[in-house]
Amino acid sequence: MMKRFLMLYAFLLTAFTLLAHNNRVAGIDMVSYPGGKCMMYRLYLKDKDLDHNPYSVNRPEEFLSARSIERRKRQGLPIDLTDLPLAPAYEKAVTDAGIEIVGKSKWNNTLLIRIHKEKELRKLEGLDFISKMMKVFAAPDSVSQRMRSGVRRELNEWGNGAGFYGAADAQLKAMNGKRLHESNHLGKGKMIAVFDGGFMNVDKIPALHDIKLAGVKDFVVPQSKNIFSEMEHGTMVLSTMAANAPNFYVGVAPEAEYLLIRCEDERTESLAEEDYWASAAEYADSCGVDIINSSLGYHGFDDAATNHHYYEQDGKTALISQTASMCADKGIVCVNSAGNDGMGAWKKINFPADAKDILTVGSINEQGTNAAFSAVGPTADGRIKPDVMAYGSPTCVITGRGSIINDNGTSFSSPLIAGMVACLWQALPHKTAKQIIKLVRLAGNNQQHPDNVFGYGVPDFWKAYQTGKAIK
């Protein structure tokens, strides 16, 4: 994830101090990794054993919700073999061998397994349906202890902002989103899945009490006891869309439904998080979501040997990017932050921001120019990225303690676009995911000369609506 890396300077301590402050580093409490010493491997399966698989594309109601099936039907999209669950016989053979399955992806035909010693892999010898194995995670010795912050009452007693939208007014205005709101399109009937690492105090912050919550799910191994006690990043992302406190802070899609999914492990950076993301996307699809907001991105990991390379940015090499590229074919608009590496050595967008048929979102400042940190394109196969831009330097957000602050990052640009996509799609219900993506791009203020810094520019969502309405 695009984390804020904090340099920790520790001094040499005496042996007594080390003993007295066991498991502390530079004032931070350290604890053993909650999953214990373990490793995870991704197993690629050769097929779906169609001769014995009890599921059929002709009976999608057995593995997809009615809402998901209706979304495909509305857009003229078929149920295909990637939608079929994994072969039950293959899963059973793995578990019968004494191997724990902790994740799976039907779109990619993969399993995620957890073991505690490398020699356990020998148990899989002879299972000829496994075509490839890849190590995607090795547990660290310790991680920083996480604490849930309290909601401070005084931080939730805000003064009135500038008009109905309060502190969130400018970021909506920049996209000409008020016109859609004034025509009574605030995202009603659309479901947005929010992928993040936690949603601290979403269940307690007054401005978020009226959120239309469709559900919560956790795919990180090990799972959290409560995603509302995890990191606040997801809270800030969600607030830009869902908050509904008139005259204080109103988000861009206050009438949409929200499915909150934890698929980012803030304690570590590993390829396993791509497996979590894939599981999250498939779960969101099965629930019938219309839009995914993913303010997440990857390229460097704790194990540098597994780092991604620029030549892989083709929308299909990385598992996470291949998964994101499939969303539009399922009828889902995937919106992903570009990344914050514009000033670093990497500079490029992250994964899955390189995916095809998604909206990759960069950041602008208050003057309307691109933020220096906003990652750039193109993709390795020459596609323009980012696709569009939105406020991100700064964006006004609500923190996990309930305060309104300005914060920087493409993480907060992405949900502004995702929320407005919900409003646009509500207004144009007969459009497909790919048509909506095209309308948003063409409504950008740089659409005549798109480039790899500003993309198609900042979308005018009223213009997108007018254009879409004129096209039958």
Where do the protein language model's features map onto the residues?
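Subtilisin-like serine protease catalytic core
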Residues: 34-36, 132, 168, 178-217, ...
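Bacterial Sec-dependent N-terminal signal peptides
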Residues: 1-25
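Primarily auto-inhibitory N-terminal propeptides
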Residues: 21-96, 100, 118-144
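Structural recognition of the beta-strand scaffold that forms the well-ordered cores
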Residues: 42, 103, 110-114, 191-196, ...
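Substrate-binding/access-modulating region of protease and related hydrolase catalytic domains
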Residues: 244-247, 260-354, 380-383, 400-414, ...
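Autoinhibitory propeptides
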Residues: 89-172, 178-181, 356
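Catalytic-core environment of secreted peptidases
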Residues: 203-214, 363-412, 448
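Hydrolase catalytic cores
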Residues: 238-241, 261-265, 348, 388, ...
